Amino acid sequence: MNGTLTHLQQLEAESIHIIREVVAEFANPVMLYSIGKDSAVMLHLARKAFFPAPPPFPLLHVDTTWKFREMIQFRDRMAAECGLDLIVHVNEEGVKNGISPFTHGSALYTDVMKTEGLKQALDKYKFDAAFGGARRDEEKSRAKERIFSFRCTNHRWDPKNQRPELWNLYNTRIKPGESIRVFPLSNWTELDVWQYIHLENIPIVPLYYAAVRPVVERDGMLIMVDDERLELKPGEKVQYKSVRFRTLGCYPLTGAVESTADTLPQIIQEMLLTRTSERQGRLIDHDQDGSMEKKKQEGYF
């Protein structure tokens, strides 16, 4: 038997080690479940890490109420089929105040419905460690963040005060009220994620596959018309195009890409040829200079 691990096997082993380390060291961990491809891989790894037992922590979805309908359907189906403990948290104050990406802009909307919503949930359930599916190849602020990312009592991240991580050793010490965000997929690339999904036959939201969908061209992006809340601006018209999504978020803030890739091998082929970041389709990354780093410093994932 060949004892050499493949590249994907090495990544899998590292991620499973990280997940088990968190469960061993923290009293009340949780896994953030955003329903995207990275969350799908992370959940698959967690199930592998503790098989045949279920993962010994719940899933948490911070619901902004603006996710694609197919994402919510997929979330509920996966939780039911896998017998998972799923916590869904909504910032009810934001809903009461009518906060939306259309009327308040992406920066304020993201802060209220995502960042504050996440902090509310972490405080409510007193989680001391939270898994997230962020990867270093996605965006420059994530590239410099540690795998075990320390957060102070108000959930803020200080990029100038990060703990060293040498020889795969992680400092898990925290004081009451402090917490750690943990990123088991830090060293994975977008291509790694797709190849692993193909290899392991991991279920993903159908929006990742190309299909003819109703879209409008807005600010240089193709925004899918997912429900009646999307109001057309003067001069806009609904078009039907073959599109898919490289990244998934709130539908008014997530751009589709024109594509005919409706199978995993075709998506992987696209990844081998593309020269653009998957997050170019996320409006929240571009609503201000240093946008993602500022959001993370305020408590965003």
UniProtKB/Swiss-Prot annotation:
Annotated organism of origin: Geotalea uraniireducens (strain Rf4)
Protein name as catalogued: Sulfate adenylyltransferase subunit 2
Matching Gene3D superfamilies: HUPs
Catalysis: reaction(s): sulfate + ATP + H(+) = adenosine 5'-phosphosulfate + diphosphate
Protein family (similarity comment): Belongs to the PAPS reductase family. CysD subfamily.
One Gene Ontology term from the biological process aspect of the record: sulfate assimilation
InterPro entries reported for this sequence: PAPS_reduct_dom (IPR002500), Rossmann-like_a/b/a_fold (IPR014729), SO4_adenylTrfase_ssu (IPR011784), Sulfate_adenylyltrnsfr_sub2 (IPR050128)
Pfam families: PAPS_reduct
Pathway this chain belongs to: Sulfur metabolism; hydrogen sulfide biosynthesis; sulfite from sulfate: step 1/3
Function noted in UniProt: With CysN forms the ATP sulfurylase (ATPS) that catalyzes the adenylation of sulfate producing adenosine 5'-phosphosulfate (APS) and diphosphate, the first enzymatic step in sulfur assimilation pathway. APS synthesis involves the formation of a high-energy phosphoric-sulfuric acid anhydride bond driven by GTP hydrolysis by CysN coupled to ATP hydrolysis by CysD.
Assembly notes: Heterodimer composed of CysD, the smaller subunit, and CysN.
Region called Disordered, residue ranges: 279-301
Assigned keywords, A-Z: ATP-binding, Nucleotide-binding, Nucleotidyltransferase, Transferase
EC category name: transferase
